[in-house]
Amino acid sequence: MGKEKIHISIVVIGHVDSGKSTTTGHLIYKLGGIDKRVIERFEKEAAEMNKRSFKYAWVLDKLKAERERGITIDIALWKFETTKYYCTVIDAPGHRDFIKNMITGTSQADCAVLIIDSTTGGFEAGISKDGQTREHALLAFTLGVKQMICCCNKMDATTPKYSKSRFEEIVKEVSSYLKKVGYNPDKIAFIPISGFEGDNMIDRSTNLDWYKGPTLLEALDQISEPKRPSDKPLRLPLQDVYKIGGIGTVPVGRVETGVIKPGMVVTFGPSGLTTEVKSVEMHHEALQEALPGDNVGFNVKNVAVKDLKRGYVASNSKDDPAKEAANFTAQVIIMNHPGQIGNGYAPVLDCHTSHIAVKFAEIQTKIDRRSGKELEKEPKFLKNGDAGFVKMIPTKPMVVETFMSYPPLGRFAVRDMRQTVAVGVIKSVEKKDPTGAKVTKAAIKKK
């Protein structure tokens, strides 16, 4: 066995009819972990329903449908391998909760793959009516997804087919708006593809011999290696807390930054509860240490299940321990709110695993969301498309951090009326010092 490949996450974005499902389905189909029997079953069903043309998207639709019905899909189905990486596709958008998942999501995407419909009319639709293309690209950039690959899809259906001039026209236009969002187009690979026919997806296409750049597979291999934040202090937001007979209390969550290991004394924010970690395990195997990206359960001493909750954050008691936020200031972008948002607005914030109502105490400034320049001091309200700096006060104890220090704990979705109405990035946090927090015997011994 050679060294295991590096894991990276990609998020596929673009307008609703751009061919995201077909393209993603094709990659997973050709390079992925989908069992051949499953594919044959899908193909048979697709043929029976005269959906032959829909083969790759059909694979993805079946996976989505099964996942939405709560049938746990083997997550390997959403993975594929390149020569250098194991790639996981983060929730393909179009899914209702895509924006929320991208923000609070189990993982930060390392690269966005933007799919553009190159057909006449298709491209214009995706880009114009404030199509989702812009919104998704802005979102990816705001949330720190700095690498991008842009696929000009449906090249088999341009007029004439595989048109070089159409490709060049699209590259020019898309470059100019990605630049407005904040990306540097010179660092983005633009690839003419057909997700359905397979041109330039994995193998070089003879239909596009005028194109000299990388195929999609080669471009994915050229993504620069993500740096995992294991050198930062520990932050592990809890997803659940279990009581396991014979073992005791076992909090479960994903290490976002730093490391956790047996013997470490951890402090849980916001309550300040401090105790010793007895053991750490992943997939039923004991670990000597867990690193960022690992989903782990860990056993803590002298702690009742009721003392810990989803949304609490485990941290190293000796290294910048997590504390309750008294208030924080964030850059907020309003994305789909039907009215006006003024001081006193109190929606729910989804930040890492916590889900807590937060009050917009003071809208400090309205800013240009691309350049960050101030447009207005203390505006009365913010509406759709606006961005601003807002001071926020949680209605219940919660842990948040600045996006600079701990990115996964510094971005959030604002939820109201069952949808994501805004996204935000935290710039500064005022923390409370815990008073009278419980320190277990095990932790005192370790001191």
Swiss-Prot record:
Which parts of the sequence carry N6,N6-dimethyllysine? 55
Where is the region G4?
A: 153-156
Q: Which residues carry this modification: N6-methyllysine?
A: 261
Q: Which InterPro entries does the record match to this protein?
A: EFTu-like_2 (IPR004161), G_TR_CS (IPR031157), GTP-eEF1A_C (IPR054696), P-loop_NTPase (IPR027417), T_Tr_GTP-bd_dom (IPR000795), TRAFAC_GTPase_members (IPR050100), Transl_B-barrel_sf (IPR009000), Transl_elong_EF1A/Init_IF2_C (IPR009001)
Ranges for the region named G5 are 194-196
User: Per the record, what is one GO cellular component?
Assistant: cytoplasm
Q: Give the originating organism.
A: Daucus carota
The record's function comment reads: This protein promotes the GTP-dependent binding of aminoacyl-tRNA to the A-site of ribosomes during protein biosynthesis.
Instruction: Write out the residues that bind GTP.
Output: 14-21, 91-95, 153-156
Q: Which protein are we looking at?
A: Elongation factor 1-alpha
Q: Give the similarity note.
A: Belongs to the TRAFAC class translation factor GTPase superfamily. Classic translation factor GTPase family. EF-Tu/EF-1A subfamily.
Q: Where in the cell is it found?
A: Cytoplasm
Q: From the UniProt entry, list the residue stretches annotated as the region G2.
A: 70-74
Q: Extract the ranges annotated as region (G1).
A: 14-21
